């Protein structure tokens, strides 16, 4: 990269490391709450002004009510018998991150795909900011293309880069 570089890690630069254990307790309690399929009282862990920022297909939820109505309810309607398994968690001051998977049964409509009854894996990454004992912000990546593939739908219509990995297609390279 030529020229000046963008400023990095602005949001977490001044984190208060003394809050690490408090953050851990909030996140661990929240994950337990999600595994218990709590919706109505999940506000125990989230600020009312909570913002949930997901990738394309997931959307952005402004406030706890939108999160409950436009994420939790449709997600639980589409996927039953689900369990969240964080494979790794990191805690740093008011910040936490995790990646893992949810294992669930496709029991309701999802992205226009009728229920299949298949047991599937939903991979994700989460980054949380906890302030005064409540989650204020949550940046989320949910691997919906992987979910759709398990349900028989290729959202890349055969143009996913997995074709490079398998040798089906030759990967392009930038011009010198």
Specify the residue positions occupied by each region the protein language model found.
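Short, structured motif recognition centered on aromatic/hydrophobic residues
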Residues: 24-28, 52, 72-75, 125-128, ...
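Short, solvent-exposed aromatic-acidic interface loops
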Residues: 139-148
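Beta-strand elements of well-folded, non-transmembrane domains
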Residues: 35, 104-106, 130
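Short, surface-exposed coil-to-beta transition loops
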Residues: 83-84, 121-125
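A solvent-exposed, acidic/Ser-Thr-rich amphipathic alpha-helical stretch
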Residues: 21, 40-94, 101-103
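A short, structured loop/turn motif at beta-sheet edges
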Residues: 89-97, 129-136
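Short, low-complexity N-terminal intrinsically disordered segments enriched in polar/charged residues
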Residues: 2-48, 156-176
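A cross-kingdom feature marking solvent-exposed beta-strand/loop segments within repeated
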Residues: 56-58, 105-120
């Amino acid at each position: 990269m030529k020229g000046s570089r963008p400023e990095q890690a602005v949001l977490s630069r001044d984190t208060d490391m003394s809050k690490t254990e408090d953050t851990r307790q909030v996140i661990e309690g929240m994950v337990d709450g999600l595994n218990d399929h709590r919706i109505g009282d999940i506000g125990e862990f989230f600020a009312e002004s909570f913002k949930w920022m997901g990738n394309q297909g997931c959307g952005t939820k402004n406030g706890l009510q939108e999160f409950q109505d436009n994420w939790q309810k449709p997600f639980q309607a589409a996927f039953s018998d689900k369990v969240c398994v964080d494979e790794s968690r990191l805690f740093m001051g008011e910040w936490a991150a995790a990646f893992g998977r949810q294992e669930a049964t496709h029991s309701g409509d999802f992205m226009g795909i009728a229920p299949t009854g298949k047991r599937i894996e939903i991979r994700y990454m989460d980054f949380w900011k906890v302030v005064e004992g409540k989650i204020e912000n949550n940046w989320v990546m949910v691997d919906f293309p992987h979910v759709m593939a398990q349900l028989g739908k290729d959202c890349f219509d055969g143009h996913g880069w997995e074709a490079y990995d398998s040798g089906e297609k030759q990967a392009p390279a930038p011009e010198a």
